[in-house]
């Protein structure tokens, strides 16, 4: 009877063999396809890593350029801070009574040349007239305000302030009406 069943269904045997072959082909194609997918994923991963590294390098270069520009822009800051007391001393010397005209003229020339050199580097005096601004002025004393002098205005300047571009080197020391 077993032979009879095989003879009756030779088509079933062929169909089963074809199904086995198709399954084997699918299994053999699956690893190839997954290897291809893995290779594509790795390629995408490497591309992403490359793009990130490239962007990071551009950011590093941009930051280095900005830092170099900042250093260039504020290179004279330390020198200016060292020279400002000399300018203050020249102003005090010019305020002394009894100087001969020649000495006074010589001191004024030195003062003007120093101020000119500072201006060429972007260093300028902070205006100390009008309203008090805590960003540029340091109140060291207050005096009562009156009708002629409203509150929060500058009464007197004890020491001039200076700035380098937008950076304060030294705030102006002032007396403020309160």
Swiss-Prot record:
Assigned keywords, A-Z: Chaperone, Cytoplasm, Stress response
What residue spans carry the Basic and acidic residues bias annotation? Answer: 1-19, 30-42
Q: Which CDD domains match?
A: GrpE (cd00446)
Any idea which GO molecular function terms this record carries?
adenyl-nucleotide exchange factor activity; protein homodimerization activity; protein-folding chaperone binding; unfolded protein binding
Q: Which pairs are disulfide-linked? A: none
Gene Ontology CC terms: cytoplasm
Membrane-crossing residue ranges in chain numbering: none
One GO term (biological process)? protein folding
- State the residue spans of region: Disordered: 1-42
- Entry superkingdom: Bacteria
State its location(s): Cytoplasm
Broad class of the protein's primary localization: cytoplasm
Q: Which HAMAP family match?
A: GrpE
* Entries under PANTHER family matching the protein: GRPE PROTEIN, GRPE PROTEIN HOMOLOG, MITOCHONDRIAL
- Homology family: Belongs to the GrpE family.
User: Do you know which NCBIfam families this protein is assigned to?
Assistant: PRK14140.1, PRK14156.1, PRK14162.1
Query: Whom does it interact with, and what assembly results?
Result: Homodimer.
Q: What does this protein do?
A: Participates actively in the response to hyperosmotic and heat shock by preventing the aggregation of stress-denatured proteins, in association with DnaK and GrpE. It is the nucleotide exchange factor for DnaK and may function as a thermosensor. Unfolded proteins bind initially to DnaJ; upon interaction with the DnaJ-bound protein, DnaK hydrolyzes its bound ATP, resulting in the formation of a stable complex. GrpE releases ADP from DnaK; ATP binding to DnaK triggers the release of the substrate protein, thus completing the reaction cycle.
Q: What is this protein called?
A: Protein GrpE
Q: Which organism is it from?
A: Streptococcus sanguinis (strain SK36)
Taxonomic lineage of the native organism? Bacteria, Bacillati, Bacillota, Bacilli, Lactobacillales
């Amino acid at each position: 009877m077993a032979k009879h069943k095989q003879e009756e269904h030779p088509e079933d045997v062929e169909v089963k063999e074809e199904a086995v072959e198709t399954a084997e082909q699918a299994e053999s194609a699956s690893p190839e396809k997954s290897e291809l997918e893995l290779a594509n994923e790795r390629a995408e991963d490497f591309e992403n890593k490359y793009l990130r590294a490239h962007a990071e390098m551009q950011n590093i270069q941009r930051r280095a350029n900005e830092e170099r520009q900042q250093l260039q822009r504020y290179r004279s800051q330390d020198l200016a801070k060292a020279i400002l007391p000399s300018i203050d001393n020249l102003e005090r010397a010019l305020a002394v009574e009894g100087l001969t005209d020649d000495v006074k003229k010589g001191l004024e020339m030195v003062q003007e040349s120093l101020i000119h050199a500072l201006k060429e580097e972007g260093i300028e005096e902070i205006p100390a007239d009008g309203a008090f601004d805590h960003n540029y002025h340091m109140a060291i004393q207050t005096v009562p305000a009156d009708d002629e002098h409203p509150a929060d205005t500058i009464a007197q300047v004890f020491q001039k302030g200076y700035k380098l571009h937008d950076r304060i080197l030294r705030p102006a020391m002032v007396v403020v009406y309160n």
